[in-house]
């Protein structure tokens, strides 16, 4: 389709469906079909302001420190700001954010110093060199002081009730070694939420076919220490390889049936949806 025809098609889509309709069509063309019902009503799956307030005032019997670890590398400021604001907006407050930065410049360091130096929960380490996704994640894990480790990619965002729901699950199942949640996608350009991944409960057979667990993944720190670091030989599939090692050590793996993780899709992503290739 030539440029003129593309422009005419876009104008027609805007007239018929508006800018939102055009954005959805572009996303479908770039990635995969959209679940229009979810895209239209995604906020119904999120915590309300009233629920958030109740959660903020909830006292659990066990209120562990949760360390959310993030490997950074030339992370766009807009993505990092949204990630951090998502952490600051958590209804559960006993957390720390461990940022391990393998960037060749000090741009991120300066950004954090200018905007977030007052919050001691946000911890930053500038790495001497970029070791890749696995090594940088290992550095972030090494910073962690929490009882549980949550894995967050540098361009993604947690739902406001993510850590609350994790801690609620931990209180309901004190034996839990691994916890994971449902997730959706958020388009970097339009901000549209789409492609929810409503997962099955722990299913070892399905996990042999592909990494359906994916995000949001939380692991007890002692269990993570037992299975060992992320293996850089599996960069690109390091989460999957870690999960498989975890399943060799425990079956105390619990699923939170709520969307707690927003996976940002943009042109720099290698993969954009959970599938056998993830």
Walk through the language-model features, giving the residues of each.
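Conserved small/polar residues in nucleotide/adenosyl-binding loops
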Residues: 271-278
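Short aromatic/hydrophobic "clamp" motif used to bind/position activated sugar donors
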Residues: 149
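Catalytic donor-sugar/metal-binding loop of nucleotide-sugar-dependent glycosyltransferases
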Residues: 245-262
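Glycine-rich, basic loop-to-helix element that forms the pyrophosphate-binding segment
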Residues: 127-144
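Short, acidic, metal-binding catalytic loop of nucleotide-sugar glycosyltransferases
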Residues: 85-94
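N-proximal low-complexity "stem/linker" segments adjacent to membrane-targeting elements
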Residues: 23-85
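A conserved acidic beta->alpha catalytic loop
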Residues: 101-110, 129, 153
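Conserved donor NDP-sugar-binding/catalytic core segment of glycosyltransferases
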Residues: 161-192
């Amino acid at each position: 389709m030539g440029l003129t025809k593309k422009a005419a098609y876009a104008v027609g889509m805007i007239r018929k469906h508006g800018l939102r309709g055009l954005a959805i069509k572009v996303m479908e063309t770039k990635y995969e079909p959209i679940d229009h019902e979810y895209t239209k009503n995604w906020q119904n799956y999120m915590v309300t302001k009233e629920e958030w307030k109740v959660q903020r005032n909830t006292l659990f019997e066990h209120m562990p420190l949760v360390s959310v670890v993030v490997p950074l590398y030339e992370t766009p400021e807009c993505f990092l700001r949204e990630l951090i604001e998502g952490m600051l907006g958590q209804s559960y407050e006993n957390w720390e954010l461990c940022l391990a930065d393998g960037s060749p410049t000090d741009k991120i360091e300066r950004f954090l110093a200018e905007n977030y130096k007052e919050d001691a929960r946000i911890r930053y380490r500038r790495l001497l060199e970029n070791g890749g996704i696995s090594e940088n994640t290992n550095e972030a894990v090494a910073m962690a002081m929490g009882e549980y480790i949550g894995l967050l990619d540098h361009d993604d965002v947690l739902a406001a009730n993510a850590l609350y729901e994790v801690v609620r699950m931990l209180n309901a199942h004190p034996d839990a070694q691994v916890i994971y949640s449902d997730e959706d996608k958020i388009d970097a350009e339009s901000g549209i939420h789409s492609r929810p991944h409503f997962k099955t409960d722990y299913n070892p057979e399905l996990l042999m076919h592909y990494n359906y667990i994916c995000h949001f993944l939380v692991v007890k720190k002692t269990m993570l220490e037992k299975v060992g670091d992320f293996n850089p030989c599996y960069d690109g599939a390091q989460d999957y390889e870690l999960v498989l090692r975890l399943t060799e050590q425990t079956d105390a793996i619990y699923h939170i049936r709520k969307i707690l993780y927003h996976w940002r899709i943009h042109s720099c992503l290698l993969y954009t949806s959970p599938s056998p290739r993830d």
